[in-house]
Amino acid sequence: MSDTDGKKTLGLRGGAPRPGNVKQSFSHGRTKNVVVETKRKRVVVPKAGATTSAGGKAPIGDPSRRPAGISDAEMERRLKAVKAAKAREAEEEAARIAEEKARAEERERRRAEQEERERAEREREESLKAKAEEDKRRKDEAEAAAKAAAAPAAEPVVQRPAAKAAPEPAPRKQQDRDRDNKRGGKGNDDSRRSGKLTLNQALAGGEGGRQRSMAAMKRKQERARQKAMGGQVEREKVVRDVQVPEAIVVSELANRMSEKVGEVVKALMNNGMMVTQNQAIDADTAELIVQEFGHRIVRVSDADVEDVIKEVEDDEADLKTRPPVVTIMGHVDHGKTSLLDAIRKAKVVAGEAGGITQHIGAYQVKTDSGQLLSFLDTPGHAAFTSMRSRGAQVTDIVVLVVAADDAVMPQTIEAINHAKAAEVPMIVAINKIDRPAADPTKVRTDLLQHEVIVEQMSGDVQDVEVSAITGQGLDDLLEAIALQAEILELKANPNRAAQGAVIEAQLDVGRGPVATVLVQNGTLRQGDIFVVGEQYGKVRALINDQGERVKEAGPSVPVEVLGLNGTPEAGDVLNVTSTEAQAREIASYRANAAKDKRAAAGAATTLEQLMANAKADEDVSELPILVKADVQGSAEAIVQAMEKIGNDEVRVRVLHSGVGAITETDVGLAEASGAPIMGFNVRANASARNTANQKGVELRYYSIIYDLVDDVKAAASGLLSAEIRENFIGYATIKEVFKVTGVGKVAGCLVTEGVARRSAGVRLLRDNVVIHEGTLKTLKRFKDEVAEVQSGQECGMAFENYDDIRADDVIEIFEREEITRTLT
């Protein structure tokens, strides 16, 4: 016994909980010892004799009830497994019953809470209603007391009981506390609100781990509240008024509708528009999308900024007579500029390259009678269609010049159409009347075909026979112009803000952007702030047609305007504004509107059109070029002429067109695209020339548009594939077929027509049907290889890689010729 003094013998522990310490680690090196209690589940197993007594079954060792081949140990093991399974089923059933009971209690608790809330809400509403009635009663009593003019009334008797009944919120707070206490640990939002800590929590990090945020708890409470109130209420669709301008970006449209960008893009694709969120669409497409999403569209326009330059009707008393604007039009080389020279007594033709007018010239002439006439001389070449159109739009009278020895030509017809479209009166000047081959009657007769009936043909169109060389009929022409101007009663108000049209624009090296403007109304003065197209500026200087500086220009006066911030387009309208801010805002709006429209036009392409264009471009060769010209009108005319060059196989693509000298930027663009640079009346600066020489960029200079168009047409013709043409040179008939070792079958032939050549192509005809086409392997005459065999001679022929030849077959000999094609 001495060995066991003070020691406990080994044995099994009871079912009491075993305490233990767990070391819990947190961030920043903090630790905490946590006491953890673990409880062992007690497995309830029936007693050993219970099964036998209850079921009346035989004992384990009863050989009569035991299956054959089963030992006692195996039988005992099976019985224990059955007992354990039954015990587990009993535990699971008990757990299920407990869980259902807990769920029922939870439902009951929530129902009680809901009823409590409804009761509290009813009490609050009743309290508010009673308070309102009490206030109304007091007000009525006060009014009655005031009417009776009695002494100051004492406090209402019912005020004290009301004061006693007032503290209503106190029981409600107590009820809320009681309800919170009833919820217990299971109804709490998070386990961190309880004081217990389980083993899993301690091992997983416990309180030091990631906790649920207050926002998550609030969301959970909100979901529970909505669930208790009968489920989430479906949010109603908000119908908005969506403002849509002329062009809008897809993402901006989605933002204004408060819709997802992806949904808007999907709707556009369903309507056949392959666009992204950064592309712009037009207003009509945007309206369809807005209506599809159930919103209301409000069409707006950014053009409100242009209200300050809207045309104002002038009073009749302010209008004064102005000089007429006369445009001289006609076919090339019919003497338009020479006629104007004779009127102005100057030499304009000498200043034009090749004697061809390539700009719109604006001049003012004073007649012998003292009357002022403003003349516009338009080009007659086919490339300057847009210039003639602009000249017809700003003019009052059109003088149609027709050569008496050439009659009506294509540009003459075009000028007639421009005049009719602009609805301006016409005067026919039959020029070159001094020529021996002049036939003015033929001119008048030809004009009848185009609905131009002159006075000598009982019409209302004046016609004058003139000669720019001898001066014959010039006075009659000026008299006819003055008469027509008197009939039109041309008037304008000089005492208002100026308005005019840009006839021509160019980028001058020393003076910057220069615009030739024909003032149509008002007076343009030095220092005026103006907007013209997408550009704006302040009038720095005004130069008239004589090259002299002037302070102002009235109606129908052509002047050159200096002081623009950029080169405007020919045909733009000039308007004077009161402030520079207005001019800048209008110019910015116009530039953005033009850019948005170009983007919207490019985006409005369906997938089928994209695929069709891509397939068409595969078979078309392109000649890229860059165009730089001295004035905007010439650049525009060259671009239009380039667009007309080409066919289904080749076309000319103008990568860039601009005004001014050729710069290094142009050379860089030309090098990247492998394009030549065409300079029309401009030259490259020194740095651009050096860069072009280093990078191998071709620079071409022109002063006559004929030469430029012809050179580009010749270069484009070089991209055309050559035409293959077959020329038949002879026929031969096979008389007999021989077999030669090392060669194969050889045809003994008689050349019946033409000549047979070794280098030519051959076809084998059998019963007039082509059965083979190829080349000759050998051509022999008397065992000698020959280059050709003349008609009537015999020879031997062997085909390359073909042996199926028979007697009486016919051999057709031909040669292929490549013919260079040109563009017409």
From Swiss-Prot:
GO terms for cellular component: cytosol. Residues 86-144, 170-193 have a biased composition (Basic and acidic residues). Residues 355-359 are annotated as: G2. Residues 431-434 are annotated as: G4. One of its GO terms (molecular function) is translation initiation factor activity. Residues 45-57, 145-167 have a biased composition (Low complexity). The keyword Hydrolase does not apply. Residues 377-380 are annotated as: G3. HAMAP family: IF_2_B (MF_00100_B). This is Translation initiation factor IF-2. It comes from Roseobacter denitrificans (strain ATCC 33942 / OCh 114).
